């Protein structure tokens, strides 16, 4: 099995095992290993693929899904200037603490600053807008994706895929996969998240769940702060 296929399957398997249900992919050449791996997972109904040709549109589409569900949504694109189109949505995700998992395909690092086609400085292109960044050049074992960092905002994984990009192995790499489905909470019901911990913070502000004023008032009458 070639390096790009191994790396893509390792990443996709972890994403599926984490309970991620949707991925938004913009077609391209360099991200072909990821696209094929996600397609294999979708054929087993392990994940749903949404295809958007324009990267800016794709990023905001994923942002909306992540915002509505509270679950991480990966966005996948090819190398080069395509990556820059993600920036507006990444900034929105950063300011709103939305779990957007940005995975950008890249050419090998040795082709940077050489004038190679579809190659630009993708490493740390989003600056401080992301909670975590990694420039991945090959599969490492054990390899663990930073899902904890997604709890506070977007994460960027820049993945270097050397040629060949096509899959050269038909092994059943999804066999025995164990999916950890996150506990579901109804974001529209008052008090839904209160059961997650014994102590917490009630956040009232811009678009924090869509509760009406009456719902907030009935959240729990025993809290004096809500009765003042």
Placement of each model-derived feature along the sequence:
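N-terminal alpha/beta PP-like core and its mobile active-site loop of ThDP/TPP-dependent enzymes
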Residues: 2-228
């Amino acid at each position: 099995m070639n390096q790009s296929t191994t790396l893509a399957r390792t990443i996709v398997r972890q994403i599926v095992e984490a309970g991620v249900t949707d991925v938004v992919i913009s077609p391209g050449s360099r991200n072909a290993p990821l696209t094929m791996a996600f397609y294999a997972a979708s054929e087993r109904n392990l994940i749903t693929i949404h295809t958007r040709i324009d990267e800016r549109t794709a990023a905001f589409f994923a942002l909306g899904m992540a915002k509505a569900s509270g679950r991480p949504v990966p966005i996948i694109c090819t190398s080069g200037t395509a990556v820059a189109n993600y920036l507006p949505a990444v900034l929105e995700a950063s300011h709103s603490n939305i779990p957007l998992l940005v995975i950008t395909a890249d050419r090998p690092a040795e082709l940077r600053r050489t004038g190679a086609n579809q190659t630009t400085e993708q490493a740390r292109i989003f600056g401080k807008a992301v909670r975590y960044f990694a420039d991945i050049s090959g599969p490492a074992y054990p390899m663990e994706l930073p899902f904890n960092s997604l709890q506070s905002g977007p994460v960027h994984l820049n993945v270097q895929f050397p040629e060949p990009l096509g899959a050269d192995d038909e092994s059943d790499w999804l066999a025995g996969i164990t999916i950890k489905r996150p506990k579901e909470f109804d974001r529209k019901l008052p008090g839904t998240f209160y059961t997650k911990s014994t102590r917490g913070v009630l956040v009232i502000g811009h678009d924090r769940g869509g509760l009406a004023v009456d719902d907030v008032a009935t959240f729990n009458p025993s809290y004096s702060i809500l009765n003042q």
